[in-house]
Amino acid sequence: MNMQRTEQIHEKANGLDKLEGAEILAILLDSQVEAAKCVLPAIEPIERGARAMADAIINGNKLIYAAAGSSGLQAMADGLEITPTFGIPISQIKILRAGGLEDMSRPKGEMEDSEEAAINDAKIIEAGDCVICLAASGNTNYPVTIMEICKKLGATTIGIANNPDTKLLENSDIPILLPTPPEVIAGSTRLGAGTAQKIALNMMSSCMGVYLGNVMDGMMVNLIANNTKLFKRSEEIVMNITDCNRHQAAQSLKKSKGSVKLKVPRFIRLKGTPNFPITAP
């Protein structure tokens, strides 16, 4: 049986420990660039994934990420930003990670193989949900088991893996192969494989946000501001889209409890429509 690509030795890794620091870093950077390029052939399934994600949210169902290890970290990085970026209710975004989301200071690698943990975590999954199952190897037991449960429940599945001919790709409704090169540090999929996964996840969730109408001209118009930085960003968005000044933007956002989308299309005079007065709800 051939060794999976994610476990193979990188062609430039021989003698790595004998090189100067700058040479080591150049090889590491080059491997990251090559990993990023591997996302391009997957544009079509990534777009289908974005539509499936948007459909789940529109229909009131959940978007769920399921992964383990380094892939679990990529899932968290993307999933935790969905609500603050696009204003999607947190009740519709769930992250299932082998070992849980608490006490992450201690690695729990043994949980990747736990079918029991997967079965227990999958209890939140319902028909109509969209579940993204990812693993660099494509065969990690935790996300594979969750995907099998999804199929029985009628949830839509998106499988992401860095190796071809793997369980996640074979069993998913929308398979996304990211064929990254072997890692410079063999098997350390937090490197190239993780980079490609992050790019693919970011692309899908961002495209989903656009499909949901939460992005206008590159601005996150469904942003819910809850800190100084985000309040300032919200003001800039309202000012950029409308003819109002900062004071008007601030007052409007105050009335909408920080909701940009609530204010811009309905209550603020849009550029090019001078006869549409600024009013309060």
Please name every model-derived segment.
Residues M1-C38:
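Cofactor-/ligand-binding subdomain signature composed of acidic, glycine-rich
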Residues P41-A56:
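A short, well-structured juxtamembrane/interface segment
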Residues I27-A35, K94-S105, M216, D243, ...:
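Gly-rich Lys/Arg/Thr-decorated short loops/hinges at beta-loop-alpha junctions or inter-strand turns
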Residues A56-I57, C150:
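A generic structural signal for well-ordered alpha-helical segments
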Residues L63-I199, S205-N214:
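Glycine-rich phosphate-binding loops that contact phosphosugars or nucleotide phosphates
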Residues M208-P281:
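Short, amphipathic alpha-helical interaction segments embedded in low-complexity terminal/linker regions
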Residues A35-E44, C133-T140:
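Short, glycine-rich nucleotide/cofactor-binding loops
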